[in-house]
């Protein structure tokens, strides 16, 4: 008996079933809703999970290129809408759903998507206060991004022209609702940015509405573009109770378009009033400062040091006189002490008669005398140096003032200063130097004195 059975391989069967799925038009584009199950996020990879309802579930694959386009972060148990196609995975012979799009289900999904995006951008620091730019006090030009037909631009222009007519306002129209709104808002902001520093501040806004109506101002692309603006942005989206991500990232938020215009412009009347007040305060401060400086000048004019400038050096002159006196006294005391020592040694030498002792004493005397003269010479040299320095200080201060107190100095015919009577001879001609001239005298008598007493 001939066996007419045809046996297929497992691969052939899986391929056949796969072709059935691909040829079925109902499975080319399938839209599903369900709850995410077994979802485990895989970094930089394809995502594998299940989609289930109350009665059954199906395995789902979402390739990395599709997953990276999602505007929210899927989580376990989240209800979602997905679209894609059904096919067979050949190696295992199992069919599964290949998801191409995914979005949260219902209005709650929008809030969840908003929450996730807000957390993401907050972690990046887009809402931090340190990134907020200061609104200029006196803007020259203001750019407004809103609908060209709404009441927003009218309220802004009326308020700004009333408060600060100097400011020029330019409208950059954009759709503020619908699927294309986010792209037009971003395009308008980029157009403003491309003009450099033409504008001082930007106002972006629209009137109130539902979450879906305000959704363009929650789009990530809009938030990032506001953050990237080089000039400050004031957001006025919806009513005061509405808060969008555009409000959080903007440099300032206003509850209404009118409030936004007030935020962007100063009140000219208030500014003029402040100028008048500041002018009065400035004038008073200047007058007070001038009065204070006059008082200081009067005190300086009456200061003793300016009335008698020479008194500045009185203390230094007294110090020099005191040093000279102490130097002379020290030299006299040292000479008296050393003279007494010498005389004592001479007496002791006379008391010793043996020649050897005499020779020894002679050597000791010579040694002592040598040391004495060396010490005296060194001491005198040191004292002379100190005296010279003191005299130099005195001379630096005012040598003429020393002469003006009645002092004179004497020179011989060669111009040498005479400091001792030992330098003089009878009938020798000398010059006495005064502060206002010189006198020539002859030596008639020479009398030596020691310590102020005439020598006998």
UniProtKB/Swiss-Prot annotation:
Enzyme class (EC, first level): hydrolase
Residue spans crossing the bilayer: none
Any one GO MF annotation of this record: exodeoxyribonuclease VII activity
Catalysis: reaction(s): Exonucleolytic cleavage in either 5'- to 3'- or 3'- to 5'-direction to yield nucleoside 5'-phosphates
Documented EC number(s): 3.1.11.6
Signal peptide: none
Domain of life: Bacteria
Matching InterPro entries: Exonuc_VII_L (IPR003753), Exonuc_VII_lsu_C (IPR020579), OB-fold_nuc-bd_dom (IPR025824)
Keywords for this protein: Cytoplasm, Exonuclease, Hydrolase, Nuclease
Main localization, broad class: cytoplasm
Compartments it resides in: Cytoplasm
Function: Bidirectionally degrades single-stranded DNA into large acid-insoluble oligonucleotides, which are then degraded further into small acid-soluble oligonucleotides.
Family: Belongs to the XseA family.
Quaternary context: Heterooligomer composed of large and small subunits.
Protein name: Exodeoxyribonuclease 7 large subunit
Gene coding for it: xseA
């Amino acid at each position: 008996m001939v066996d007419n059975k045809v046996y297929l391989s497992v691969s052939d069967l899986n391929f056949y079933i796969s072709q059935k799925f691909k040829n079925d038009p109902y499975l080319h584009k399938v839209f599903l809703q369900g709850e995410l199950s077994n979802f485990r996020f895989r970094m930089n990879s394809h995502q594998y999970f299940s989609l289930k309802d109350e009665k059954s579930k199906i395995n789902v694959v979402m390739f990395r290129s599709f997953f990276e386009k999602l505007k929210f972060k899927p989580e376990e148990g989240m209800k979602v809408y997905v679209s894609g196609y059904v096919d067979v995975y050949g190696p295992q012979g199992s069919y599964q759903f290949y998801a191409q799009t995914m979005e949260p289900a219902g209005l709650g999904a929008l809030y969840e998507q908003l929450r996730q995006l807000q957390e993401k951008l907050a972690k990046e620091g887009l809402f931090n206060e340190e990134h907020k730019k200061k609104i200029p006090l006196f803007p020259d030009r203001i750019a407004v991004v809103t609908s060209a037909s709404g009441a927003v631009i009218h309220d802004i222009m009326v308020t700004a022209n009333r408060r600060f007519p100097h400011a020029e306002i330019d409208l950059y129209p954009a759709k503020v609702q619908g699927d294309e709104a986010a792209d037009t808002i971003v395009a308008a902001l980029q157009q403003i940015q491309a003009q450099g520093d033409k504008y001082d501040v930007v106002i972006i806004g629209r009137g109130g509405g539902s979450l879906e109506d305000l959704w363009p101002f929650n789009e990530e692309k809009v938030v990032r573009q506001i953050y990237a603006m080089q000039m400050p942005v004031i957001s006025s989206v919806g009513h005061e109770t509405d808060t969008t991500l555009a409000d959080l990232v903007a440099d300032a938020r206003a509850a209404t378009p009118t409030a936004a215009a007030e935020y962007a412009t100063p009140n000219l009347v208030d500014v003029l009033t402040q100028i008048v007040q500041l002018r009065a305060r400035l004038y008073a401060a200047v007058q007070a400062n001038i009065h204070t400086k006059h008082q200081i000048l009067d005190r300086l004019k009456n200061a003793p040091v300016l009335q008698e400038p020479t008194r500045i050096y009185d203390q230094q002159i007294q110090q020099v006189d005191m040093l000279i006196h102490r130097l002379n006294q020290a030299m006299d005391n040292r000479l008296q002490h050393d003279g007494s020592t010498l005389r004592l040694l001479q007496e002791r030498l006379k008391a010793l008669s043996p020649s050897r002792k005499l020779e020894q004493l002679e050597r000791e005397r010579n040694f002592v005398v040598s040391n004495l003269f060396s010490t005296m010479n060194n001491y005198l040299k040191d004292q002379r140096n100190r005296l010279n320095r003191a005299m130099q200080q005195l001379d630096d201060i005012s040598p003429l003032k020393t002469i003006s107190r009645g002092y004179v100095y004497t020179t011989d015919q060669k111009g040498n200063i005479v400091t001792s009577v030992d330098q003089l001879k009878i009938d020798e001609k000398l010059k006495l130097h005064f502060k206002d001239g010189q006198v020539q005298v002859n030596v008639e008598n020479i009398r030596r004195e020691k310590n102020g007493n005439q020598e006998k």
